[in-house]
């Protein structure tokens, strides 16, 4: 894996920096693990925009990734190949189990074709193996962590993501996330050893607006250049400031305002990610 800076043959390529991984499969993905994916463009069933700045972009199939990895315990497997996935920042790995079934999983850092893998409580503590947290030594770096047993991984799934197992107390373990938050999870929740691969993803430079449109992301217009009917910051004669603290188009404070309302899981957070 390497960062490649392109030659300035055009304004768009002048600042472009790409992540090149020669180990990725160059052919078509595994067809039985593909599903159709329809463009929603950020609209709901009424056609109203519920998520702004979405629309357009290149068509692509959804790769069915196994986030649970709980029904192949004890069955040896090996990595057939690594693949690019347009639906996420991390790369994925096509895994062949000894019973002949193939599945996609999130590729961990250092994973290569031919690498043996194992799921279950008897799996060795090696990068890429998936097992319950009760069987993982304290201090181990983990990724793809479940929040509820059997629900599938929800924490540390993006490129370069990881968490650290800090402690185990009774039925719960403490996990420190990249944000600094320390969270309690049940010891029967599963996790994968190691970090998520493609850690250089955050260092890429897209280079031009069109490449962002290819990804299905539409432009973000500043509220201060809108009309008063469209945004609280809008209006004024000539180039003017917002005239108030930054807010969203609906008047909610935009910077530093906490919006978390899930009180049901507050007891699972040992240390908040906020410093104060």
Curated annotation (Swiss-Prot):
SUPFAM superfamilies: Nucleic acid-binding proteins, Translation proteins SH3-like domain. Residues 50-59 have a biased composition (Basic residues). It comes from the Bacteria. One of its GO terms (cellular component) is large ribosomal subunit. Disulfide bonds: none annotated. The keyword Ribosomal protein applies. InterPro entries: NA-bd_OB-fold, Rib_uL2_dom2, Ribosomal_uL2, Ribosomal_uL2_bac/org-type, Ribosomal_uL2_C, Ribosomal_uL2_CS, Ribosomal_uL2_dom3, Ribosomal_uL2_RNA-bd_dom. GO terms for molecular function: rRNA binding; structural constituent of ribosome; transferase activity. Keywords: Ribonucleoprotein, Ribosomal protein, RNA-binding, rRNA-binding. Belongs to the universal ribosomal protein uL2 family. Part of the 50S ribosomal subunit. Forms a bridge to the 30S subunit in the 70S ribosome. One of the primary rRNA binding proteins. Required for association of the 30S and 50S subunits to form the 70S ribosome, for tRNA binding and peptide bond formation. It has been suggested to have peptidyltransferase activity; this is somewhat controversial. Makes several contacts with the 16S rRNA in the 70S ribosome. HAMAP family: Ribosomal_uL2_B. This is Large ribosomal subunit protein uL2. It comes from Cupriavidus necator (strain ATCC 17699 / DSM 428 / KCTC 22496 / NCIMB 10442 / H16 / Stanier 337).
């Amino acid at each position: 894996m390497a960062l490649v800076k392109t030659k300035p043959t055009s304004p768009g390529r002048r600042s472009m920096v790409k992540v090149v991984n020669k180990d990725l499969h160059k052919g078509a993905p595994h067809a039985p693990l593909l599903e159709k994916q329809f463009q929603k463009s950020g609209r709901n069933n009424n056609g109203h925009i519920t998520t702004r700045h979405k629309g357009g972009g290149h068509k692509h199939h959804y790769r069915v990734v196994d986030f649970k990895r709980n029904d192949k315990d004890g069955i040896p497997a090996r990595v057939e190949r690594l693949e690019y996935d347009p639906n996420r920042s991390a790369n994925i790995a096509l895994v062949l189990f000894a019973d002949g079934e193939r599945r996609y999983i999130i590729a961990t850092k250092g994973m290569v074709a031919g690498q043996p893998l194992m799921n279950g409580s008897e799996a060795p503590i090696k990068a890429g193996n998936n097992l319950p947290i009760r069987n993982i030594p304290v201090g181990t770096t983990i990724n793809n962590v479940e929040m509820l047993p059997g629900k599938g991984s929800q924490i540390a799934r993006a490129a370069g993501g990881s968490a650290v197992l800090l402690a185990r107390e009774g039925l719960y373990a403490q996990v420190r996330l990249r944000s600094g938050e320390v969270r309690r999870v049940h010891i029967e929740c599963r996790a994968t050893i190691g970090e998520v691969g493609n850690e250089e993803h955050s260092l890429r430079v897209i280079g031009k607006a069109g490449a962002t449109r290819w990804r299905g992301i539409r432009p973000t217009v500043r509220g201060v250049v809108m009309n008063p009917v469209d945004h609280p910051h809008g209006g004024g004669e000539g180039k003017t400031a917002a005239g108030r603290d930054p807010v969203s188009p609906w008047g909610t404070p935009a910077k530093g305002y906490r919006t978390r309302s899930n009180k049901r899981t507050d007891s699972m957070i040992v240390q908040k990610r906020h410093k104060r």
